[in-house]
């Protein structure tokens, strides 16, 4: 049984729950408790505060965890980063009052900076030879300059709307962050085998995220031109149609390129083009 620590609530919790469902880890519909066992995968889910997850994994309270890179780097716990998960993207940035002119990093010299991430900020300032006064605040960092607690802040930025509503502007991006899968360094063979299955399933879901399944009909004399348009994984699948001289072609394309590819296929004589989502892809 593999114990997976995830965030108790919030946006990352919601997206983590979606990922777990996509990889086949479904939880009972009963009221959530601190620890729940999956009925479809040899795992149990431990619900924790996001800043407690790195330590829980490092200490073996949980075997693996899903947490933001920002929390992992701030806590500096002895755990292994297995992979980035592609959601809950944000950045850790320095922000100052919007009316201030910003000539560069030296603006922060001897300034008071409020943050919930003192270790990351301290390392950044030291690297850039900036001496500043770091004030640790656990939450609501963005209000600090407005009430006179600090001159600037160092905090998570997603859309930037929170900064705007507090009359702040982002001036330096220190690091980018997203959800990551971390693991305890000393998993036994049985737990490691379950972890490898989990990684395999996550890879299958991630690979499919930007892919679409495409089906189309085309005259046989256009097949070679169409093959040049379709990237595919190896080569397109072809089925003869009842209509003489025509074939049905199946392949996989990138969603980002789908409209460009569709236009090229139409110009090459393709008809009846269907684009279908892919849930999982095993390469």
UniProtKB/Swiss-Prot annotation:
Control of this protein's activity: Feedback inhibited by histidine.
GO cellular component terms given for this protein: cytoplasm
InterPro entries per the UniProt record, alphabetical: ATP-PRT_HisG_long, ATP_PRibTrfase_cat, ATP_PRibTrfase_CS, ATP_PRibTrfase_HisG, HisG_C, N-reg_PII-like_a/b, N-reg_PII/ATP_PRibTrfase_C
Primary location: cytoplasm
One GO term of the biological process aspect: L-histidine biosynthetic process
Localization per Swiss-Prot or TrEMBL: Cytoplasm
EC code(s) of this entry: 2.4.2.17
Task performed by this protein: Catalyzes the condensation of ATP and 5-phosphoribose 1-diphosphate to form N'-(5'-phosphoribosyl)-ATP (PR-ATP). Has a crucial role in the pathway because the rate of histidine biosynthesis seems to be controlled primarily by regulation of HisG enzymatic activity.
Protein name per its UniProtKB record: ATP phosphoribosyltransferase
Organism: Azobacteroides pseudotrichonymphae genomovar. CFP2
């Amino acid at each position: 049984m593999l114990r997976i620590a995830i965030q108790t609530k919030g946006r990352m919790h919601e997206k983590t729950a979606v990922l777990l469902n996509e990889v086949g880890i479904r939880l009972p519909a009963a009221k959530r408790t601190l620890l729940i066992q999956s009925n479809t995968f040899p795992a149990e889910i431990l619900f924790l505060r996001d800043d407690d997850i790195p330590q829980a994994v490092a200490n073996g309270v949980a075997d693996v965890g899903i947490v933001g890179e920002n929390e992992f780097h701030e806590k500096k716990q002895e755990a292994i980063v297995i992979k980035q998960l592609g959601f809950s993207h944000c950045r850790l940035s320095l922000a100052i009052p919007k009316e201030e002119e910003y000539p560069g990093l030296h603006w922060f010299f001897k300034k008071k900076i409020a943050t919930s991430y003192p270790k990351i900020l301290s390392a950044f300032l030291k690297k850039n030879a900036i001496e500043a006064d770091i004030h640790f605040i656990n939450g609501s960092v963005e209000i600090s300059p407005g009430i006179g607690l600090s001159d600037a802040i160092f905090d998570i930025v997603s859309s930037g709307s929170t900064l705007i509503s507090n009359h702040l502007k982002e001036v330096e991006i220190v690091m980018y962050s997203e959800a990551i899968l971390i693991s305890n360094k000393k998993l036994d063979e049985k737990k490691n085998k379950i972890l490898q299955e989990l990684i395999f399933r996550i890879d299958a879901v991630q690979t499919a995220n930007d892919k679409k399944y495409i089906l189309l009909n085309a005259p046989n004399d256009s097949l070679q031109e169409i093959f040049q348009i379709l990237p595919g994984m190896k080569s397109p699948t072809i089925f003869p149609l009842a209509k003489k001289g025509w074939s049905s072609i199946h392949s996989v394309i990138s969603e980002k390129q789908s409209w460009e590819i569709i236009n090229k296929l139409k110009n090459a004589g393709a008809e009846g083009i269907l684009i279908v989502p892919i849930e999982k892809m095993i390469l």
